[in-house]
Amino acid sequence: MSVTRTKTHNDVVVTLGLKNILVGTLAGRDEKRKIHQGSKAINLTLAKMAQHVGPDLTVLDGTEGMQGNDPVDGFAIDSRVTLASAHNIAADVIGLQVMGYRLDHVGYLRYAMELRRLTLDDIEVIGERIEDVKIDFKPHDNIASHLTWSVEGDWRPVFDAVAD
């Protein structure tokens, strides 16, 4: 189970349920530092880890989110939205949309969707419409560098080279 606040992140645009549990499973500070090796590397590594580890239930507590230069210098946002799903990727994809971001902003989720052959049409939202609860979270000041996650051309050989 992964329970986390909706928040922006200094390397991967947002931290939601999947990243919360993936990084939380790493043993120590050194292991966590190893995956933070630039935008391309961290997004490929998180997608690779997501093939092996993932919560059975994700709860995104957005009653009060965190925006801006999180995790060190972020500030609260009163978003008053809570999301839950038994499908970890679906929860995060809807969560990032509620925060005002698109799937192509968050590499590890985009890769995870492609690996599982999922599309946005495969995700059913029950309850409020995204448009009715969406609140734009202020991104990290360095968001331009975070959006360089995409590997040119076919990313799968690079993905396959990432150690399990």
Where are these regions (language model features)?
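Extended, low-polarity segments enriched in aliphatic/aromatic residues
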Residues: 2-164
